[in-house]
């Protein structure tokens, strides 16, 4: 989720399977009269029945998590996906993302036993966010198989979000969707999800950005990609994907955010694209950024620019970052426009007098707290007459609107994004998959 600058296959066996148990055969011999051979007065032996036992779910050790392997091959998933990832990884250890070693003055970290011991302290956090990442990979694989011209955006986001809820075993604030699914088309760069009743249908000429998030215990995966149906847009996608990978490459402990932005812009703007006989430079959208991520807070306080001239603040050990870039054929600057769908609670607190607004705020606190939400989710939960109450909370400053961010009409914007973690020993690109 972007940050704008201030203006059916057979399921695998699981750990929950019960051991099969049959009634133990009665080996006592019985005579024609029906009495046991042990004598007239001997009592009949009762059949013994084994009690069914459930295997205890294994507890992943810190060592198992630290030594987690990349995604194993041969995972079984249905289509559409219905098997939670916890059932696929029965040992409770989820696969790590792509590991990139630190360079230069931090290269010692790769083999430092002291730094490796530090990682063990945070093993459970790593496992939580890797679970969220694995859900993201599997859901987007499914979505990449169903997205096509003629598909409605509402059907697309509902299919994606339902799959996410199932695979992550959504449970209130413990695990679930981290923010509304962005399905921004063409010149719309970010923050568009359909409100209830939206009838928008994908067309062959569209450039679609799919930006969605998952979380476990507040540890968020924020990851996005671009879908097109015409190869004429390939150079736009290639430029943005390369720019994002450049940002990831330059990220690391002690890396300066402004230098990362300069590197991203240099790569992005070395590309151009020809559309309908006219050549367009591909430019970084200067007022969109990547960002740090904190538990339950998608925009964690630090911004990762995608143009030169940014602050020289350093990245630090233990931080999570969403490295995302946007390339545009237009003016390369976005403004807020169109009907709002994204909302998020602020830190501001004040008295709420309107009963409906007070009731809605209680629901938001319980189900989303500081996570972003959308109007469609409120409708889904039965809060279908929420607009006046929601507007009241926005007017009070308790809730903030995040309207769609748009470039110039007629332009095309592409986006790629990954979430990474600056561990003590290495940089882990948590959301990396075999697709991008």
UniProtKB/Swiss-Prot annotation:
Compartment list: Cytoplasm
Binding of substrate, residues: 191, 299
HAMAP family: MetAP_2_euk
Stored NCBIfam families: met_pdase_II
Segments of skewed composition (Basic residues): 44-56
Textual note on the cofactor: Binds 2 divalent metal cations per subunit. Has a high-affinity and a low affinity metal-binding site. The true nature of the physiological cofactor is under debate. The enzyme is active with cobalt, zinc, manganese or divalent iron ions. Most likely, methionine aminopeptidases function as mononuclear Fe(2+)-metalloproteases under physiological conditions, and the catalytically relevant metal-binding site has been assigned to the histidine-containing high-affinity site.
One cellular-component annotation, GO: cytoplasm
PROSITE patterns per record: MAP_2 (PS01202)
Name of the molecule in the record: Methionine aminopeptidase 2
Cofactor annotation: Co(2+); Zn(2+); Mn(2+); Fe(2+)
One Pfam entry name: Peptidase_M24
GO BP: proteolysis
Region of interest called Disordered, as start-end residue ranges on this chain: 1-61
Positions with a binding annotation for a divalent metal cation 2: 222, 291, 324, 417
Catalytic activity: Release of N-terminal amino acids, preferentially methionine, from peptides and arylamides
Biased amino acid composition, Acidic residues: 16-26
Function: Cotranslationally removes the N-terminal methionine from nascent proteins. The N-terminal methionine is often cleaved when the second residue in the primary sequence is small and uncharged (Met-Ala-, Cys, Gly, Pro, Ser, Thr, or Val).
Binding annotation for a divalent metal cation 1: 211, 222, 417
Primary site of residence: cytoplasm
GO molecular function annotation: aminopeptidase activity; initiator methionyl aminopeptidase activity; metal ion binding; metalloaminopeptidase activity; metalloexopeptidase activity
Gene: metap2
UniProt xrefs under InterPro entries: Creatinase/aminopeptidase-like (IPR036005), Met_Aminopeptidase_Type2 (IPR050247), Pept_M24 (IPR000994), Pept_M24_MAP (IPR001714), Pept_M24A_MAP2 (IPR002468), Pept_M24A_MAP2_BS (IPR018349), WH-like_DNA-bd_sf (IPR036388), WH_DNA-bd_sf (IPR036390)
Superkingdom, taxonomy of origin: Eukaryota
UniProt keyword terms in alphabetical order: Aminopeptidase, Cytoplasm, Hydrolase, Metal-binding, Protease
EC annotation from Swiss-Prot or TrEMBL: 3.4.11.18
Record-stated family: Belongs to the peptidase M24A family. Methionine aminopeptidase eukaryotic type 2 subfamily.
């Amino acid at each position: 989720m972007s940050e704008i600058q201030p203006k059916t296959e057979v399921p695998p066996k699981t750990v929950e399977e019960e051991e099969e148990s049959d009634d133990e055969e009665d080996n006592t011999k019985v005579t024609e009269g029906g009495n046991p051979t042990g004598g007239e007065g001997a009592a009949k032996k009762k059949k013994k029945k084994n009690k069914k036992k459930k295997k205890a779910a294994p507890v992943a050790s810190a060592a198992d998590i630290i030594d987690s392997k990349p995604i194993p091959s041969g995972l079984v998933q249905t289509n559409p996906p219905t098997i939670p990832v916890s059932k696929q990884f029965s040992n409770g250890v989820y696969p790590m993302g792509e590991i990139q070693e630190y360079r230069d003055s931090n290269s010692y970290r790769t083999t430092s036993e002291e730094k490796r011991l530090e990682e063990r302290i945070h093993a459970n956090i790593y496992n939580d966010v890797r679970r969220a990442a694995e859900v993201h990979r599997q859901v987007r694989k499914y979505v990449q198989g169903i997205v096509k011209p003629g598909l409605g955006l509402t059907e697309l986001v509902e299919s994606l979000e339902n799959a996410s809820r199932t695979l992550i075993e959504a449970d209130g604030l413990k695990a679930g969707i981290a923010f509304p699914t962005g399905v921004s088309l063409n010149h719309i760069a970010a923050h568009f999800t359909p409100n209830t009743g939206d009838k928008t249908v994908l067309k062959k000429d569209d450039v679609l950005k799919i930006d969605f998030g998952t979380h476990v215990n507040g540890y968020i995966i924020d990851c996005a990609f671009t879908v097109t149906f015409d190869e004429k847009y390939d150079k736009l996608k290639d430029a943005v994907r390369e720019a994002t990978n450049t940002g990831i490459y330059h990220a690391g402990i002690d890396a300066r955010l402004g230098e990362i932005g300069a590197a991203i812009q240099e790569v992005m703007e070395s590309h151009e694209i020809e559309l309908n006989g006219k050549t367009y430079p591909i430019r970084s959208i200067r007022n969109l950024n990547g960002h740090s991520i904190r538990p339950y807070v998608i925009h964690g306080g630090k911004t990762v620019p995608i143009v030169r001239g940014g602050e020289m603040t350093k990245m630090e050990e233990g931080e999570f970052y969403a490295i995302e870039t946007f390339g545009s054929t237009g003016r390369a600057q976005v403004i807020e426009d169109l009907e709002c769908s994204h909302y998020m609670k602020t830190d501001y607190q004040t008295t709420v007098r309107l009963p409906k607004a007070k009731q809605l705020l209680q629901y938001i606190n319980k189900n989303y707290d500081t996570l972003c939400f959308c109007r469609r989710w409120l409708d889904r939960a039965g809060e279908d007459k929420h607009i006046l109450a929601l507007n009241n909370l926005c007017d009070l400053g308790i809730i903030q609107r995040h309207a769609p961010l748009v470039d110039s009409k007629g332009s095309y914007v592409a986006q790629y994004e990954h979430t990474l973690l600056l561990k003590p020993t290495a940089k882990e690109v948590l959301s990396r998959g075999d697709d991008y």
